[in-house]
A protein has these predicted regions:
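C-terminal active-site-proximal or functional interface alpha/beta core segments in diverse enzymes
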Residues: 66-167
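Conserved alpha/beta-domain cores
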Residues: 1-106, 112
Length: 167
């Protein structure tokens, strides 16, 4: 970014270490999962990123899995992420947005996932109750929007080394 005279606005995905109660292959919110900066090092990672040239830290993201059929894991993850937001901002780094991901489930056989509006109402109530309603809030309800509507094509670009295995 600095080479072309720009500032890159970045948001880091953190791993809140929350069990979404979904299949292990589509779980992404537990400590041993492949996605996100570990909860224990998130504050230090944000501090480091905030001091890099050409970087403006603007938000925090998390994703706890896919095909989630309960609201409780989202609320648990939100509490943990808001705890991190407060710890990060206590160091002088301002976060403007909060991105909560995790694919709200769809019915394949006998699943009964909550409706997206019910989930969002509960998340917004918690965000407001904790004093974070002034932030831009992004929700990623995943397959509940597109589960029966398309195909995803991807390419692996990088591998992430983990404590117990590589992803």
């Amino acid at each position: 970014a600095t080479q072309i005279g720009r500032t890159a606005r970045v948001s880091l995905r953190v791993n809140p270490d929350v069990d979404a109660g979904t299949h292990p292959y589509i779980s992404s919110g537990l400590k041993g999962n492949k996605i996100g900066v570990a909860h224990e090092v998130a504050v230090a990672t944000y501090q480091r990123a905030a001091h890099l040239p050409g970087i403006e830290v603007v938000g925090i993201d998390c994703h706890i899995g896919s095909q989630i059929t309960e609201i409780a894991p989202y609320l648990d993850a939100l509490d943990r992420v808001l705890d991190l937001v407060e710890a990060i901002e206590a160091t002088g780094v301002t976060l403007h947005h909060l991105d909560l991901g995790g694919g709200l489930g769809i019915t394949y056989t006998d699943e009964t996932p909550p409706a997206a509006d019910v989930l969002i109402a509960q998340l917004l109530a918690k965000i407001d109750a904790r004093g974070h309603g002034h932030r831009e809030i992004v929700f990623e309800p995943g397959r509940s929007l597109v589960g029966n509507a398309g195909v995803l094509l991807t390419e692996v670009m990088f591998l992430k080394p983990g404590e117990q295995k590589n992803f």
